[in-house]
């Protein structure tokens, strides 16, 4: 029953319903009725309006409102007896509301006399209405999330799409390739291959490279110590060690007084590794390095060279003021004359501390221990430092401090 129903409609529904004959009944055919159990009728009205404290006094005061509207009037001399003023016409005033109210009351009480076939037809109509509204809702695009019904209908739609895809290609038309999206991870090959020379060693493992570098450092210190001997006749004893590594390559032999030791650290890139070449002759390029274009001899600028006397050989050591320990000054060391050491400029690898490998040479040499005024004594600084710039090939010139020695042999 509708919640917006009025009191007179509620009483009329109770009168039309045969179930509530023990609560209210007709007393005549002209629309007169009597409340047999007025309190029970008031409680039903309170339940309809959600008022639990409803009683007959409140119900009777509500009925007085319809007195003025000429809908219901009180029968004088009879208790709980009322009458619809225009009884035959009262049913025609709102027949639709009355009929709906009556059907709802009958369904609620469970005493409706509808046949089972009618109930099945009614239920089938309701289910078809619900399914139609559900399909319209799903195809309208207004829903924002999946529901159970949509998930149940999804496989059929997918199957239909698949069958249509299989039936599309015909025998008359040539086969058309399906457009497929393929994700491929390809390395970037457009970058220019930067030729980086590496140290050519027999073994490519890191342990072999570390062993070769340690052997190289020990051979360098041995050669410098033999260079500092006063009666050193030959310094080109690196042929056994050079045969073990491709980077140590002996050249054609020279006279003993002109034999020299080259220490080359050619750095083409500040971050790349390059081989150190120890040879008994002129410097040679590694076969793995690409040939570099040379300028004509007329346009080639030779790097400045410095000749140190034999008394200043001891200043090559680690803590010498002429060459600081933290200096990364690139240089060639070549014994051109018996009494002098030839110093030329060349870029030294930043990651190799060449001066640290030469640190134990001067103190451990036999000539160094002969006396306090020997040839290999460190020079004392009396007249200050004399900076001599040694410009490298591709870096700013780095000065080498040369201090005059007061003790000459």
UniProtKB/Swiss-Prot annotation:
Q: What Pfam families does the record tag this protein with?
A: Ets (PF00178)
- Could you tell me which PANTHER family the record lists for this protein? ETS, ETS DOMAIN-CONTAINING PROTEIN ELK-3
DNA-binding region(s) from the entry: 5-85
GO biological process terms, semicolon-separated: angiogenesis; negative regulation of DNA-templated transcription; regulation of DNA-templated transcription; wound healing
Gene name, please? Elk3
Q: In which tissues is it expressed?
A: Heart, liver, lung, kidney and muscle.
Q: What is this protein called?
A: ETS domain-containing protein Elk-3
Functionally, this protein is described as follows:
May be a negative regulator of transcription, but can activate transcription when coexpressed with Ras, Src or Mos. Forms a ternary complex with the serum response factor and the ETS and SRF motifs of the Fos serum response element.
Covalent cross-link site, Glycyl lysine isopeptide (Lys-Gly) (interchain with G-Cter in SUMO2): 92, 165
The chain residues annotated with the modification Phosphoserine are: 115, 398
Its localization reads:
Nucleus
Q: Ranges of Low complexity compositional bias? A: 278-287
Matches recorded under InterPro entries: Ets_dom (IPR000418), ETS_fam (IPR046328), WH-like_DNA-bd_sf (IPR036388), WH_DNA-bd_sf (IPR036390)
| Keyword annotations | Activator, DNA-binding, Isopeptide bond, Nucleus, Phosphoprotein, Repressor, Transcription, Transcription regulation, Ubl conjugation
What's an example GO cellular component term for this entry?
nucleus
TM ranges are: none
């Amino acid at each position: 029953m509708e919640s917006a129903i009025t009191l007179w409609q509620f009483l009329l529904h109770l009168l039309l319903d045969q179930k509530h004959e023990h609560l209210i009944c007709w007393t005549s055919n002209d629309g007169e009725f009597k409340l047999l159990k007025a309190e029970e009728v008031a409680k039903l009205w309170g339940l309809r309006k959600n008022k639990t404290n409803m009683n007959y006094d409140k119900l009777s005061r509500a009925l007085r409102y319809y007195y003025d509207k000429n809908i219901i009037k009180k029968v004088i001399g009879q208790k709980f007896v009322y009458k619809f003023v225009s009884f035959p016409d009262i049913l025609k005033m709102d027949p639709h509301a009355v009929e709906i109210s009556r059907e709802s009351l009958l369904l609620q009480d469970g005493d409706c006399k509808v046949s089972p076939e009618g109930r099945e037809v009614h239920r089938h109509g309701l289910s078809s209405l619900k399914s139609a509204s559900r399909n319209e809702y799903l195809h309208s695009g207004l829903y924002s999330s999946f529901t159970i019904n949509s998930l149940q209908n999804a496989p059929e739609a997918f199957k239909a799409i698949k069958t249509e895809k299989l039936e599309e290609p015909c025998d008359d038309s040539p086969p058309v390739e399906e457009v497929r999206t393929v994700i491929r991870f390809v390395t970037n090959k457009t970058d220019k291959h930067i030729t980086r020379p590496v140290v050519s060693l027999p073994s490519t493992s890191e342990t072999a490279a570390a062993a070769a570098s340690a052997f190289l450092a020990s051979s360098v210190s041995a050669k410098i110590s033999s260079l500092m001997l006063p009666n050193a006749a030959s310094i080109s004893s690196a042929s056994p060690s050079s045969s073990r590594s491709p980077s140590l390559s002996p050249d054609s032999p020279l006279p003993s007084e002109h034999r020299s030791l080259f220490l080359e650290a050619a750095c083409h890139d500040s971050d790349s590794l390059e081989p150190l070449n120890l040879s008994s002759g002129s410097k040679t390029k590694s076969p793995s390095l690409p040939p570099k274009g040379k300028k004509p001899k007329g346009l080639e600028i030779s790097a400045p060279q410095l000749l140190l006397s034999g008394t200043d050989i001891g200043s090559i050591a680690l803590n010498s003021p002429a060459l600081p320990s933290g200096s990364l000054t690139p240089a060639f060391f070549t014994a051109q004359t018996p009494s002098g050491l030839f110093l030329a400029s060349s870029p030294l690898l930043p990651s190799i501390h060449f001066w640290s490998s030469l640190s134990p040479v001067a103190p451990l040499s036999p000539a160094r221990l002969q006396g306090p005024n020997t040839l290999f004594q460190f020079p004392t600084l009396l007249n200050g430092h004399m900076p001599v710039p040694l410009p490298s090939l591709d870096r700013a010139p780095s000065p080498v401090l040369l201090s005059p020695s007061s003790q000459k042999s």
